[in-house]
Structure formats: C-alpha cells, structure tokens
C-alpha cells in the first residue's frame, strides 16, 4: 500500500469511525507527512507496511534536533495512532511505534510574588471599612495557602 493511500484511508477512519475534528485530523496527517517527507528527502523507498522501528527512530532523532519535547510527543502520538490503524486494518502485523517512548515534558514553575510584593499589597488595603478587612483576609489566606 502506498503512503498516500494509507494516509487517506487513515483520515477517513479518523473522521468517520472516531469522529475527530478536522483540526485533529490535519495534525495527524501533518505528523505522518513529516515521516514521509523525511523518507523522500533521504531517498528511502519503503512502504508503510514495511517500515521498521529503526527507520522511525532515525526520523525521530532528526526531529529531536529542531523540535521541542512537546512537539516530539505530538508527532510520536500521531504516528502511533497511524500505525495502530494499519494494524487494525491488517495492513501491518505489528506497530513499530509500540516500543518508542515519548520524551518527558518538563513543567515550568509558576512565577511567585516576593515577600516585599505581598507586603506592598497588604499595605495598600484600606482597613477603614469592612471591605478592607475582607480583602486582607482573602489576600492572607491566598498567601498562606501558597496560591
């Protein structure tokens, strides 16, 4: 089966069987197309049925040089779904993506206020009425909870 036919069948499956949005389908197609483009650029003539995990690992290594871990994870997820589909439709016997792990995605810690900034906020509260005491209570509770 040619790549173009496999991709079209996969898109049809995603739309009809899985009911995914057009945007999601476009992203999956884009991910698989990146692999196909890599194979074409490197003059590697292999079908979707015959590609092995080593070629895919080479592709992912090249991707890792220019893409962040979140993008790499999305591409891996798209390829995993594509090859799951090929196995489901009996175009392939196995999914070469099964043993390929997604990169860890680091989380950015939130920016926090300094003690000086908190003190300035508290000092700015007008304590001449009940709303000021309410606001002070809310700010102190948020601060003490680490929010």
Show which residues each predicted segment covers.
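Conserved catalytic core of the tyrosine transesterase superfamily
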Residues: 1-147
């Amino acid at each position: 089966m040619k790549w173009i036919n496999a991709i079209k069948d996969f898109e049809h499956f995603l739309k009809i069987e899985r009911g995914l949005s057009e945007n999601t389908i476009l992203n999956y197609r884009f991910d698989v197309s990146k692999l196909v483009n890599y194979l074409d650029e490197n003059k590697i003539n292999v079908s979707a049925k015959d590609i092995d995990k080593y070629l895919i690992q080479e592709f992912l290594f090249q991707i890792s040089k220019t893409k962040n871990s979140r993008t790499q994870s999305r591409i891996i997820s798209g390829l995993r779904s594509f090859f799951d589909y090929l196995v489901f439709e009996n175009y392939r016997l196995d999914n070469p993506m099964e043993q390929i792990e997604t990169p860890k995605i680091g989380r950015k810690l939130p920016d926090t206020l300094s003690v000086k900034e908190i003190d300035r906020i508290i000092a700015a509260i007008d304590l001449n009425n009940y709303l000021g005491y309410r606001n002070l209570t809310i700010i102190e509770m948020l601060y003490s909870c680490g929010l």
